[in-house]
């Protein structure tokens, strides 16, 4: 994340995705907020989930994420937007969400998917602009 190039953008994308799982489990969104662009839908949804867990007394178990960008050097920054569009392979461990009474309200099995993570710079720091499905074609 220390370099202002595709390698730095890839490191920021991997870190943010992995931090998302931690933020939910720890109910701590401080680092996630700092890297979330105000227009990022995925970011907003994740921050809302953390806030819900904190206010409702619910908990999130499992869900650890591992993120990987294969060959970051092949990605180029969009000159008009300044954004690096990166394809990130994400493995998420099985997870369970319970309410304050310990009643399971959601669960997901382990999954592997590829997501498009758009990474930009703001005031010299990396920010996540969006995380979405990889465009077809």
Across the structure, where does each feature detected by a protein language model lie?
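Residue-level signal for well-ordered alpha-helical segments
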Residues: 1-2, 8-9, 27, 63-67, ...
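Core segments of small alpha/beta cavity-forming domains
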Residues: 1-61
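Sparse, context-dependent recognition of short Cys/His-centered cofactor- or disulfide-binding micro-motifs
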Residues: 9, 17, 50, 69-75, ...
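A short, amphipathic edge element
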Residues: 55-74
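N-terminal short leaders/motifs
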Residues: 23-26, 68-86
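Exposed beta-sheet edge and beta->alpha loop/turn motif
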Residues: 76-137
């Amino acid at each position: 994340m220390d370099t202002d190039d595709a390698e730095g953008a890839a490191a920021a994308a991997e870190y943010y995705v992995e931090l998302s799982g931690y933020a939910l489990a720890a109910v701590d969104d401080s680092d996630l907020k700092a890297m979330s662009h105000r227009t990022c839908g995925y970011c907003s949804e994740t921050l809302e989930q953390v806030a819900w867990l904190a206010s409702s007394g619910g908990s999130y178990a499992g869900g650890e994420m591992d993120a990987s960008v294969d060959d970051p050097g092949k990605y180029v920054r969009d000159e008009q937007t300044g954004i690096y569009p990166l394809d990130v392979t994400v493995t998420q461990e099985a997870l369970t969400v319970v309410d304050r009474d310990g009643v399971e309200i959601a669960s997901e099995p382990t999954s592997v998917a590829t997501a498009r993570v758009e990474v930009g710079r703001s005031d010299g720091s990396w920010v996540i602009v969006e995380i979405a499905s990889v465009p077809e074609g």
